[in-house]
Amino acid sequence: MEDNIPKFDIPLDFIVGDSITGEILNQYGRFPCKIKAGVFVLCVQGSVQATVNLTKFIIKPNDFITLPPGCFIQIHEVSDDVKLCFAGFSSTFVSHINYIKTITNYLPVIFDSPVMPLPVPVSQLYQEAFSLLIKAYSLPKTIENKEIIKAIFTIFMQGVIELYKNHTPYSNAPMTRNMEICRE
């Protein structure tokens, strides 16, 4: 059954950008898709209605989305003015990094609530970080070094952990049974 579900991966170790259009996202609306890559997204403008891991979300400006490998997504509706910043790491690259050890305590929460609204100042900080990465990515041979890509991935993962610690009610909440199973 799982083989019948389309899979989304990235052909390069790392990509970053802000040029995803509603037209591109709408191509993922016809069917659910399994994420093989690790993807981080910041909604800057517009909105997206999507189902992530069987939960429907309305993604709006200042929402940060974490899509670790193994999650499922289906896009339902995208506004014409949508603007998203994104960073993605291929499944091949992610498979060579022991990120699970870093986020073990938060992985169940991330799978349960992958969309996190950020305060405007924090969202602006992330926009600036994406902008800097996009500029660096556009320079020749800047992002060929796997150690640099690993450092960028680590920054994103640590950033996600801090976001969940500081901007969600989950840090001290008891774990649901699904979260306990995911953690195991």
Language-model features, listed with the residues they occupy:
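Short, residue-level hotspots on alpha-helical faces of the histone-fold
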Residues: 151-159
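A short, Lys/Arg-enriched amphipathic alpha-helix from helix-turn-helix/homeodomain DNA-binding modules
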Residues: 171-184
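Short beta-strand His + acidic residue motifs that chelate non-heme Fe in jelly-roll/DSBH
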Residues: 49-51, 67, 73-79
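Generic protein-terminus/edge-of-domain signal
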Residues: 1-60
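A hydrophobic/aromatic-rich effector-binding and dimerization subdomain
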Residues: 2-11, 76-138, 158-166
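Short, solvent-exposed positions on alpha-helices
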Residues: 124, 143-151
